[in-house]
């Protein structure tokens, strides 16, 4: 019985028993923030079980896609090494919400297993909770299971109700006993019945768990019977498929065998029992469905778990000799197996492939380098030894190796990892990052005076500003002398302190015979402004009165960019959609840099529309208005609160053009003051986050003039009017392509000539097979594959290996005619030579490619081919 039939029969059986078939919910739980991923069938019904949600049915059945990787439920490290661990699995379940209870739940389960699935009754064992006499009697007296195959399990986990057969949603809440059904694989497999000392063996395998929620547990541990007890059951599709298909390992069922075969196809591996193929087959399921449900590879949360799974799969592909992107090519094979049951997978297959390919390409750049570092480090660690934490951290921080990936490799080499050392290295980096943060100059200053009164909204110059504190090298002092760097705190200031993405002001603090150049303004603490800079003249003391003067030109450029950011944010939401939310910003005199939530690059048309909308607001020359009001009133009035910002009870609301946002920054008086708005770049900075950089005013004018000058220069070089540049460039490109084609044909002729010479002069016959191994000079490495194909045809039966080197890199191509691949495989041949020249290789049995870097070792490696082939023919 195929896996798809097993799933279908399960759902149809319970539908015939009055159950509503409920589609699988997302792998990202929508109702439980404590869960990283959906890990069982009951998750989507949690609020129904607790009474918070009512549904139009009291009986339900589902096939729930589930993930156990990361967080409390993490099977990742075991996947590929055991018969039943998976990152992704399907949980078949039936549920009763105050409808039927133990009798029907047990009767339904037994009928499905023995009548529909036709499992031999003598192969089925059951367990019940020690005190659940009701379930015991149903199994023994009504179903007729022999008592020797019914096992009572007590509190076997060290506390009251702590048992394999007692389920609890949490420390408090719904709970109750459960009964589990086991399948006996027979005496040929080691293991004992559940509850016995040998229960960890593989002979008796749990296939179905029936949970009876019949109590409410309070904080004191008291159990109160529920007025409407419920049923929650779960049976892993992969486990029951293994039983019904007569195999012992989940990886031997039809669904996995198709995926394993596909993984072997993409990696060029012949041994379908290789554990790495199991890892890849498992991981393509988890990765694909996580992407379907909106998870994108990133460096935090669910996205990082996905990234870890992808990179673990890629490492196993690399272990099999596959150095090129391959994982994404398994998506169509997965759709063929599971697309009918889960149409959302088929609908998003292209998107899934794109995300996986992008992640493969990103990690592929560092995987090989990281593996070399790890190989060198492991060569110095004996079996049973410890890989140091600094190497672990370097692989994690520089090469993107998740720690569990490195641990996976170390386990294969029988080496432990120094997690304490890794955590210490990680903490050192955190300390360094904190020290280098944006409050680097102000952090740690001890200030206990009054807050600074900010006057910079209305004026850029303030007389009578009194010095309330001075700091040199982080230490409070009474005076500062000329030539010293210092932080000055004033009772009032026109200087804006860095906040909300807007940089701090610069300028001067002056008095008679005294001049302090302010290089930056940062907050020492909430409401206290620190003016950071250099005392150029005089002696500055606490209590001095100064004239504070902001650099007006720099401030004007900054406020133009800040106000333009508000208009751009609003325009982005109009053009791209209401999902656009700010994820970060930097506003300085040169530009505005704006990060926002969006999952695709902006098109040229979208960028042009945003520019047009913003510049229309600029031309309207509307006045900006700032008001202070209660936060709740501001939000009710339509003001946008920004991601990551913290607001007090009272906020400042800025209306500028068609935008209304909460903002404490400084802005233009009218939109016309912005002058001109131009987007100069757009790109991605993280999964689901795009970045736009834009300029305004005189900076935008200079940029336009520079772009025009570049166009004029290009027109001069190509001898074409600016308006005709696209056509002229297309002509030049066509000419270049034609010349490249001529060059390629010439190289092919040279290569063919060189190949003919090799066939005549260098091929030797070994046991009736022509063997040719040679280094080709003055030949483009890209031409090697064609040469190998030609030589195979010319010499067949033949085994050919050609090498070329350029710029310190060796290219290897091996080919074996089809009639010889049973004895000699091209992938093995290329791998043999590549290993001697400091590289790796692999591919199909008839054609393989590889490379290396040790050019000096190449002649000896080529010379060794004949003996290697002779041993195998």
UniProtKB/Swiss-Prot annotation:
**Reactions this protein catalyses:** tRNA(Ala) + L-alanine + ATP = L-alanyl-tRNA(Ala) + AMP + diphosphate
Localisation per UniProt entry: Cytoplasm
EC identifiers of the protein:
6.1.1.7
| InterPro entries xref list | aa-tRNA-synth_II/BPL/LPL, Ala-tRNA-lgiase_IIc, Ala-tRNA-ligase_IIc_anticod-bd, Ala-tRNA-synth_IIc_core, Ala-tRNA-synth_IIc_N, Ala-tRNA_ligase, Ala_tRNA_ligase_euk/bac, DHHA1_dom
From the UniProt record, list the coiled-coil ranges: none
The primary site where this protein sits is: cytoplasm
Q: How is the cofactor bound?
A: Binds 1 zinc ion per subunit.
Q: Where on the tree of life does the source sit, at the highest rank?
A: Bacteria
Q: Which cofactor does it need?
A: Zn(2+)
Sorted alphabetically, the Gene Ontology BP terms of this entry are:
alanyl-tRNA aminoacylation; negative regulation of DNA-templated transcription
User: What is any one of the record's Gene Ontology cellular component terms?
Assistant: cytosol
Q: Which GO terms describe its molecular function?
A: alanine-tRNA ligase activity; aminoacyl-tRNA deacylase activity; ATP binding; tRNA binding; zinc ion binding
Q: Which UniProt keywords apply?
A: Aminoacyl-tRNA synthetase, ATP-binding, Cytoplasm, Ligase, Metal-binding, Nucleotide-binding, Protein biosynthesis, RNA-binding, tRNA-binding, Zinc
Q: Which family does it belong to?
A: Belongs to the class-II aminoacyl-tRNA synthetase family.
Q: Which HAMAP family match?
A: Ala_tRNA_synth_B
Function field? Catalyzes the attachment of alanine to tRNA(Ala) in a two-step reaction: alanine is first activated by ATP to form Ala-AMP and then transferred to the acceptor end of tRNA(Ala). Also edits incorrectly charged Ser-tRNA(Ala) and Gly-tRNA(Ala) via its editing domain.
Name of the protein: Alanine--tRNA ligase
């Amino acid at each position: 019985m195929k896996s798809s039939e097993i799933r279908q029969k399960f759902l149809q059986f319970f539908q015939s028993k009055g159950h509503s078939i409920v589609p699988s919910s997302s792998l990202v739980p929508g109702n439980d923030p404590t869960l990283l991923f959906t890990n069982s069938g009951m998750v989507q019904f949690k609020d129904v079980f607790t009474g918070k949600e009512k549904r139009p049915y009291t009986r339900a059945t589902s096939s729930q896609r589930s993930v156990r990787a990361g967080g409390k439920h993490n099977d990742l490290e075991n996947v590929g090494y055991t018969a039943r661990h998976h990152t992704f699995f399907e949980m078949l379940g039936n549920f009763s919400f105050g409808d039927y209870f133990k009798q029907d739940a047990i009767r339904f389960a037994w009928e499905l297993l023995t009548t529909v699935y036709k499992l031999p009754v003598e192969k089925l064992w059951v367990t019940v909770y020690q005190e659940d006499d009701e379930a015991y009697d149903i199994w023994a007296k009504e179903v007729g299971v022999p008592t020797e195959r019914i096992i009572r399990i007590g509190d076997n986990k060290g506390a009251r109700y702590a048992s394999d057969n007692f389920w609890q949603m949490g420390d408090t809440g719904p709970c109750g006993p459960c009964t589990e059904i086991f399948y006996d694989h027979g005496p040929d497999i080691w293991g004992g019945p559940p509850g016995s000392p040998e229960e960890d063996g593989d002979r008796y395998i749990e296939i179905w768990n029936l949970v009876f929620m019949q109590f409410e547990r309070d904080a004191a541990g008291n159990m109160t019977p529920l007025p409407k007890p419920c049923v929650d059951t779960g049976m892993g599709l992969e486990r029951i498929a293994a039983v019904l298909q007569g195999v012992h390992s989940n990886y031997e069922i039809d669904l996995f065998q198709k995926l394993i075969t596909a993984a072997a196809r993409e990696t060029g591996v012949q041994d379908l029992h290789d554990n790495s193929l199991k890892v890849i087959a498992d991981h393509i399921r988890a990765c694909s469905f996580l992407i379907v449900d909106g998870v994108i590879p990133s460096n935090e949360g669910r996205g990082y778990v996905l990234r870890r799974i992808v990179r673990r799969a890629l490492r196993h592909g690399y272990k099999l000799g596959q150095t090129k992107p391959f994982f994404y090519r398994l998506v169509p094979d997965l759709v063929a197996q599971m697309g009918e049951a889960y149409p959302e997978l088929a609908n998003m297959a292209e998107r899934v492939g794109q995300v996986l390919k992008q992640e493969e390409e990103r990690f592929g750049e560092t995987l090989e380098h990281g593996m070399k570092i790890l190989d060198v480090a492991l060569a110095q660690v004996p079996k049973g030894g410890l890989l140091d934490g600094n190497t672990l951290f370097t692989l994690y921080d520089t090469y993107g190796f998740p720690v569990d990936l490195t641990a996976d490799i170390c386990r294969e080499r029988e080496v432990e990892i120094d997690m304490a050392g890794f955590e210490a290295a990680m903490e050192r980096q955190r300390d360094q990052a904190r020290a280098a943060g944006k409050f680097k100059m102000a952090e740690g200053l001890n200030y206990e005076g009054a807050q600074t009164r900010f006057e910079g909204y209305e004026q850029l110059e303030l007389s009578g500003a009194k010095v309330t504190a001075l700091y040199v090298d982080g230490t409070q002092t009474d005076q500062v002398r000329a030539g010293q760097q210092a932080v000055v705190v004033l009772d009032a200031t026109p200087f804006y302190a860095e906040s909300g993405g807007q940089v701090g002001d610069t300028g001067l603090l002056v008095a008679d015979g005294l001049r302090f150049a302010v290089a930056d303004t940062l907050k020492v603490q909430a409401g206290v402004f620190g003016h950071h800079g250099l005392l150029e003249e005089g002696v500055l003391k606490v209590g001095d009165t100064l004239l504070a003067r902001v650099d007006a030109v720099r401030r004007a450029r900054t406020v133009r960019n800040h106000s333009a950011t508000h208009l751009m944010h609003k325009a982005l939401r109009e053009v791209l959609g209401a999902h656009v939310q700010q994820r970060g910003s930097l506003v300085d005199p040169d530009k505005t840099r704006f990060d926002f939530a969006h999952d695709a690059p902006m098109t040229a048309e979208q960028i042009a529309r945003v520019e047009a909308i913003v510049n229309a607001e600029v031309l309207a020359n509307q006045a900006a208005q700032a008001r202070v009001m209660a936060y709740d009133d501001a939000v009710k009035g339509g003001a946008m609160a920004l991601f990551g910002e913290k607001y007090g009870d009272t906020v400042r609301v800025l209306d500028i053009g068609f935008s209304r946002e909460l903002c404490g920054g400084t802005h233009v008086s009218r939109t016309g003051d912005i002058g001109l708005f131009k987007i100069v770049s757009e790109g991605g900075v993280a999964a689901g986050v795009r970045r736009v950089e834009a300029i305004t005013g005189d900076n935008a004018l200079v940029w336009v003039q520079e772009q025009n000058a570049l166009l004029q220069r290009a027109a001069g070089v190509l001898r074409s009017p600016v308006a005709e540049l696209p056509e002229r460039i297309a002509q030049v490109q066509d000419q270049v392509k034609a010349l490249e084609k001529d060059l390629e044909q010439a190289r092919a002729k040279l290569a063919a000539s060189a190949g003919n010479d090799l066939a005549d002069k260098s091929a030797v016959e070994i046991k009736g097979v022509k063997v040719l191994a040679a280094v080709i000079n003055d030949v483009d490495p890209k031409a090697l594959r064609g040469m190998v194909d030609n030589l195979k045809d010319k010499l067949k039966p033949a085994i050919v290996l050609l090498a070329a080197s350029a710029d310190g890199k060796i290219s290897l191509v091996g080919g074996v005619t089809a009639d010889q691949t049973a004895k000699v495989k091209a992938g093995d041949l290329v791998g043999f030579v590549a290993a001697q020249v400091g590289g790796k290789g692999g591919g199909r049995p008839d054609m393989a490619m590889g490379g290396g870097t040790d050019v000096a070792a190449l002649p000896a490696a080529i010379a060794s081919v004949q003996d290697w082939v002779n041993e195998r023919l």
